[in-house]
């Protein structure tokens, strides 16, 4: 049912919104299309400590809404807001998504989780 909402002709101009809720550690960004929740991202800002990037703990698009560019749109929105996003080296799905967007790792950071390295992907 939700998928049909996005398949209307372009002349109907479907309203999209991203609503942000602050948490103690960072933010939760919820994406809505035509009033329906279609996805969310949870961003940890406590790891950044003043640096121009954020750790994206979660990026989730409802299964029936995937393949329509909503995850890409949410990532681009976060890139405009935060600059860069950090991705764990064992998160292959996120790394593939960033690489499909034409982004590559430009460094290794032993940041926040000292015993783990994080590949940093610019998504702007």
Each predicted region: which residue ranges?
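Conserved acetyl-CoA-binding loop of GNAT-fold acetyltransferases
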Residues: 101-108
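Acetyl-CoA-dependent GNAT
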Residues: 3-53, 57
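Conserved GNAT acetyl-CoA-binding A-motif
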Residues: 80-92
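A structural microfeature
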Residues: 37-39, 71, 107
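C-terminal "cap" of GNAT-fold acetyltransferases
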Residues: 29-30, 89-92, 109-124
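Conserved short alpha-helix immediately C-terminal to the canonical SAM/SAH-binding motif I
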Residues: 74, 93-97
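A short, internal acetyl-CoA/4′-phosphopantetheine-binding micro-motif in the GNAT/acyltransferase core
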Residues: 57-66
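Conserved acetyl-CoA pyrophosphate-binding loop and the N-cap/start of the following alpha-helix
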Residues: 65, 69-77
